[in-house]
Regions:
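Beta-strand-rich extracellular passenger or scaffold domains
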Residues: 1-220
């Protein structure tokens, strides 16, 4: 899907529409009507959600008009992009975000409490929304920059940050992005760049070797 500005509207009943003015594309979402069919190993309600690939529209903006639960569907970005919500409380859930190559996606959408956003791909996910986000993130590849802005006196990029696989890097723009005690290193660890910020850890959670905490002072 390629366009300079795309609006994403939740139509309900497991359906949504992407609009760019000249073209409309329907995208299936998580379907509550299929929850009665869910079992331990099969979740038709989540499987109803489809994946979207964005490419060819470098610098485009995706605007969420409503909260989206994409279920088992993911977002793949083969281009630079901005993703934002029309309302600061609008949320996105799905199978994850993949930013490929050397591309950068500015992500300005929250995820709900108890939800864990999964980031893959060698590109950069730049978190620069507003206010306090209650969701979590798991970084398995590429770079994630946490630069959430203050809104109404509240500021937090994620409640919990996990770095896994040894290929992920998380960069902090400042010490307001996440509680240091809620940062953990999973299988094969990864890299946390405190980026000149002063942090106090009461514990460092690591499930494997490969965890690195570095301080490369960048300006954002």
């Amino acid at each position: 899907f390629r366009a300079k500005e795309i609006q994403w509207q939740n139509l309900g009943n497991g359906d949504s529409i992407l609009k760019n003015g000249a073209e409309n594309i329907h995208v299936a979402l998580e379907s509550s009507s299929k929850k009665s069919l869910d079992q331990n190993t099969q979740r038709p309600s989540l499987d109803n959600g489809k994946t979207i690939h964005f490419q060819g529209g470098d610098g485009s903006t995706l605007i969420l008009k409503d909260s989206i639960n994409q279920g088992a569907g993911a977002l793949y970005f083969n281009q630079n992009a901005i993703v934002r919500a029309e309302n600061n409380d609008t949320t996105w859930l799905g199978a994850g975000i993949v930013v490929n190559g050397d591309k950068t996606v500015h992500w300005r959408v929250k995820n709900p409490i108890n939800d864990r956003l999964s980031k893959l791909g060698t590109g950069t996910l730049y978190i620069d929304g507003q206010g306090k986000n209650l969701g979590d993130i798991s970084v398995g590849d590429g770079t994630v920059v946490l630069d959430q802005k203050s809104f109404n006196g509240q500021q937090q990029a994620f409640n919990q940050v996990g770095i896994t696989s040894g290929r992920g890097t998380v960069i902090l723009a400042n010490n307001k992005q996440v509680n240091p005690d809620n940062i953990y290193f999973g299988f094969r660890g990864g890299r946390l760049d405190v980026n000149g910020s002063s942090l106090t850890f009461h514990r460092i959670q690591n499930a494997d070797d490969g965890a690195k905490i570095v301080n490369n002072h960048r300006t954002y």
